Amino acid sequence: MGKESFKNSIELELSKSTNELSKKLESCRVDILEIIPPPEIAWEIKDDDSEEFILLGTLGNFSMVKGKAKSKKSFFINMAISAAVSKGLIQNKLRSPLKDDFNQVVYFDTEQSKYHVQRAVKRICTQIGVGVPSNLNTYGLRKLSPSERLKLVEYAIENTPNLGFVVIDGIR
């Protein structure tokens, strides 16, 4: 390949790259005049001072529960799972109005033993009054490496039909 031909190849590749970036950037443009419907609610909490609910998260977005060790984060998360699985109001506080086409809940725990994860799920079942919820899939990932956990979480998210709610208890 001659010097000029090599130079032309590089310029062509740069031009392609610039064109692809331009197209991608344009596809991300937010049009202020476009009518965009609000996202569907994934979960919300009842306001103590009224009958109104405060949005905690919408479909397609991430929410994070953060707190000190032993501050009952897992308890709160299990209430959220109960709300998502049952579609009911949990402890007169939390609800998750998931539609039937987004009603599957996947729960990963990365810290607890299989025994303790099962106990947590049994508490959820007791709370919602259902023996075995058909829309809850639970996985204990403690024994796996972080890279294995990530692969399995991604796989489950990509391959669970009608997925509406994902919980990962114990991300570091």
Positions of PLM-derived features:
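The Walker A/P-loop phosphate-binding site
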Residues: E13-I124, G131
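Interdomain "pre-motor" coupling segment immediately N-terminal to P-loop NTPase/helicase cores
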Residues: M1-K16
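Conserved inter-motif catalytic segment of the P-loop NTP-binding fold
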Residues: K99-R172
